[in-house]
Amino acid sequence: MSEQLIVAGFHRSGTSLTAQLLSHAGLFLGEWLLEEDQSNRYGHFEDVEVKNLHGQILSDCGLDWRVTDTVLPVITDRVWSRIEALVERRCTEHRLWGFKDPRVCLFLPIWKYMLPDAKVLAVYRNVADSTHSLKKRHSTQMFSNSGPNAVHRSFFEDPDLAPRMWLAHNREILTFASHYPEDTMVVSLDMIQDAFPLVWALNKRWRLGLRDVSAFEVFDAQATSRERRESPIRNEDLADEVDAVERELERLSSNTEAMLTIGDQA
């Protein structure tokens, strides 16, 4: 019987670090992974096949990856066939597999429909640090003439674009978690950086059989800044919405941290 673990989280939120850790622990993440680049020196650990599927769904909806609202996906027969083929192949070939792609936040119900027993590990980072990192990436790419300039400029022409994206993705995580609390675990990037025993927690909760690997075996402290920044949000209503979502994410991650205390008492 095959088991699945999906890694979900907004862009620049620590999902690559998390996926790298889980890969070392024995989670199969795909045959073809997105390679390292100047914004992610150790690689994204991102399944290109899944990334392309999500990109196609967004394109069919007239969108790109800069999503700022709930997506009502249009799934063509061709895309359904590709998803079904991927699921059948992976379930046949791997006892435990999963994938990581920030876009999956927008499509978690689709994957839950295809994989009813799948578990979701949701990783979040505070909005100020996450959006700062995203803007920094696009500033670097813009000045190195890498990728479409219109996309890079959009983050500076509309300063609230990145926070709106952060809100849309993390809201979808919370919606999924509210419907499937037993199949969702929420952690913060801070927890992982502070040596929370993530692999142990996953095995304890879902008995996945991962090798118990410490984050320090794969974590490069220089690769992810821990500098705290002020909120970049200009619109007060948006700031209030983001604050509410952050508080709920913090509550759920606190529940995950509480596993340590429960484990000590057991």
Task: Report the location of each language-model feature.
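Pocket-edge structural micro-motifs
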Residues: 31, 100-101, 264
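PAPS-dependent sulfotransferases, especially Golgi type II membrane carbohydrate sulfotransferases
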Residues: 1, 174-177, 196-266
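PAPS-dependent sulfotransferase catalytic core
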Residues: 1-81, 218-226
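A general structural signal for well-ordered secondary-structure junctions
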Residues: 28, 63, 183, 255-258
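PAPS-dependent sulfotransferase catalytic domain
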Residues: 56, 63, 85-212
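A structural signal for well-ordered alpha-helical scaffolds and beta->alpha junctions
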Residues: 15, 43-46, 76, 80, ...
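Electropositive, surface-exposed helix/loop patches at the edges of structured domains
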Residues: 65-84, 164-169, 245-262
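Exposed alpha-helical structural elements
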Residues: 49-56, 78-82, 86, 161, ...
